A protein has these predicted regions:
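Catalytic nucleophile-elbow at a beta strand-turn-alpha helix junction centered on a G-D-S/GDSL motif
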Residues: 44-60, 78-81
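Hydrophobic residues at beta-strand termini and immediately following loops
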Residues: 50, 75, 182-184
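Alpha-helical cap/lid subdomain in secreted, periplasmic
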Residues: 64-71, 80, 86-228
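N-terminal secretory targeting modules
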Residues: 1-48, 60, 65, 96, ...
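Short amphipathic alpha-helical surface micro-motifs
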Residues: 29-31, 53-57, 163-164
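Short, flexible loop segments at the rims of nucleotide/cofactor-binding pockets, characterized by
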Residues: 22-27, 77-81, 159
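Short linear sequence motifs
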Residues: 17, 23, 43, 51, ...
Length: 228
């Protein structure tokens, strides 16, 4: 997410911004990888992790570190909001025929990455994703938004309270729908409602230690959802 005047942007930044304008939901991002993905083996339960940079960064160091030996697929895209994620849900989740999807989204909406957004708008987009998954018999783990007390690229938003409020309704919605709620927030938040530096150096994106804290929480939620 670039916040620089056009005359100060590098050629690479300008090219990326142009590509993002032409493909707003970034439907091209995983198209090749989706085609190359091997079919689900009999008896195997594929899990798609679906989200933004927090999800994408989890697998950035290579699949050998992204839940090694597990049939888990990473479909995170940096900077995305729930509106963008909803538009690519068919090709990046449903078409992959997973048994389960882990949805982690909302923080970029609060940051205003694609313009002003209300909590109701975030809820609507997440509800739509859940309903699409349910219509295709895909089990759902709905994750809390991670703690954040400030966005480096959008200072002054004061997101901590907004994140807490959103997580409150996400938990209630998960209970109402019979979904597994994956609570990263409670396990990771500090006294300021954010992430300590050892968990996220920039206050938003987890460090290896941050992801290490998330792994057992995610695994437990997946096991619970698959057992239902």
């Amino acid at each position: 997410m670039y916040r620089v005047p056009a005359d100060q942007a590098t050629p690479a930044q300008i090219t990326e911004m142009q590509q993002r304008l032409l493909d707003w939901p970034q439907l091209q991002r995983y198209r090749g990888e989706n085609v190359a993905l091997t079919p689900v083996a009999p008896g195997t339960k594929r899990v798609v992790f679906y989200g933004d940079s927090i999800t994408e960064g989890w697998g950035r160091t290579g699949s050998e570190r992204f839940f090694p030996g597990k049939p888990y697929v990473n479909r995170g895209i940096s900077g995305q909001t729930t509106a963008q994620m909803l538009l690519r849900f068919q090709q990046d989740v449903i078409a992959l025929k997973p048994a389960l999807v882990v949805i982690l989204a909302g923080t970029n909406d609060i940051a205003g990455n694609t313009g002003p957004t209300t909590q109701a708008m975030i809820e609507d987009n997440l509800h739509a994703m859940v309903e699409l998954a349910q219509a295709h018999n895909i089990r759902i783990v709905l994750a809390s938004v991670l703690p954040v007390s400030d966005y480096p690229w959008q200072p002054g938003v004061q997101p901590a309270g907004k994140v807490t409020a959103l997580n409150r309704v996400l938990r209630a919605y998960a209970e109402e729908q019979g979904l597994v709620y994956l609570d990263y927030h409670t396990a990771m938040t500090n006294k300021d409602g954010g992430l300590d530096p050892e968990l996220a150096a920039d206050g938003v994106h987890p460090t290896p230690a941050g992801y290490a804290k998330m792994v057992p929480l995610a695994e437990a939620a997946i096991a619970l959802a698959q057992g239902r």
